[in-house]
Amino acid sequence: DFNAKEVKSEIPYQKPFAEILDIVHEYPVLDGDPLENNAYLSYNMVIGSGLDVKLNVAFSVLEYALLDAPGAPVKQALLDAHIGKDVYGSYEDGILQPFFSIVAKNADENEKEKFLSIIRGTLEDIVKNGMDQKAIEAGINYFEFRFREADFSSFPKGLMYGIDVFDSWLYDENKPFAYLQQLAIYDELKKLAKEGYFENLIQTHLLDNTHASIVTLVPKTGLAAENDAKTAEKLQKYKESLSKEEIEKIIADTKELAAYQEEEESEEALETIPLLKQSDIKRESIKLYNDEHEVDGTTVLHHNVFTNGIGYLSLLFDTKNVPNDLIP
C-alpha cells in the first residue's frame, strides 16, 4: 500500500549571468609533464533552450562551419595566432540549456585575453561580411544525412530513438517526439541561410550573450595526490564520528548488497521478463525487387526499398582484363 505524492520534478532554468564569468581552476598532471603551454582555454556560452529544436539543429551546423569544416574560420584564426597546439569546439545538446564551447588545448594561460579577442574579432567579421555559404550548406547536408540514415551501428534503432525522445520529453511532457521530427527543419535552414539567419545567431548568442564563461585550466604537479589526501582525511574524520555499531552496520549492509547483486534471479522473477514468441516472428522474408534497366548501354538494377530519402549507388566493374598486380 502507498499514498500518491505530488513531486515537483521540473528542472528549472539557470538565470542568465549579468556578465561573463572568468573562472580559473587547476588540473592534475604527472611528474615530468610540462607546466608551460599546457593550459586549456575555453569560451562557453549557453544557447537558448533545449526545447527549441530548430535552434539546436542550427547550432550543430554552426559549430561545424566555425570549428570543424576545412578552413573553419574561428579554428584557423586561433591556430594562425598560435593560441594552443589544438583548437576544437563542441555543442552540447540533449540538456535543458545547451552550451557552445570553443577550446584551445596546450595553450599559454597568460594569453586568455588574446584568445577571447581573436574569437570575438573573427565572429564580428563573419557577421559583417557573411558566413561561408558552402560550409553552412555542407553542415546542413551532413546533419540531414545523419538524421535520415539513422545508422546506430550495432545498437537497435528503436532503442536509440527511445533515448533521443528524452532530449525533449524530460523537460516538457507534451513534447516527446520533438527531436524525431527534424526533416522540415533542414529544408527551412537551407532557405534561412541565404537570409542572414546564421549571422544573426552569431550576433545574438555568441557576441551579445553574457550567459557565458571563460574557463582556464592550469596544470599542477602533485594535485592528484593532494586531492587523494583530502579525500582520505575527510573519510577518516567521518569514520571517527561513527560509533562501533554504526561501522558494523555499514559493513553488514555492504556485504548484504554484494550478496544481493551476485545472487541468481528466481524462476518467478525471470518469467516476468517479456520475451518474443515464435508466433511473433514473421516467416516471410523481406522481398527485394530487381528492376532492370538499360542506361547508355549499361545495365542498371533498381531496388525500390525505403531509404528515408537517401539514394545509394553501387558501381560494379568487370575486372577480368585487369592485371592481378593492379587489383587492390
Which residues are covered by each model-predicted region?
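Non-catalytic beta-strand/loop surface segments
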Residues: 2-52, 64-117, 132-160, 164, ...
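Ordered core of a single globular domain
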Residues: 112-136, 170-258
